[in-house]
Amino acid sequence: MLLVVIFGLVALFALWGVLRSVRNKNILGFLLAGATLFVFGWFTVMTVINSGYPTAH
């Protein structure tokens, strides 16, 4: 379950990157941070739904 925590932190940093790139009007940064947020956020949410938190045995 540590992997989900790490990917969740990556998703939070990507959210910070999205907000920062919007504030600085950086289109490429927005696209890359948005893609990272989508991928890692989706993986985190679906893993928690599938396995539960804490991990179901």
Curated annotation (Swiss-Prot):
GO cellular component, as recorded: plasma membrane
Alphabetically ordered keywords of this record: Cell membrane, Membrane, Transmembrane, Transmembrane helix
Residues annotated as signal peptide: none
Membrane topology recorded in Swiss-Prot or TrEMBL: Multi-pass membrane protein
Disulfide bridge positions per record: none
Membrane spanning residue stretches: 2-22, 29-49
Keyword hit for Transmembrane helix: yes
Highest taxon, organism lineage: Bacteria
Name of one Pfam family that matches: DUF2759
Localization in the cell: Cell membrane
Protein's UniProt keywords contain Isomerase: no
Record-given protein name: Uncharacterized protein YqgW
Organism: Bacillus subtilis (strain 168)
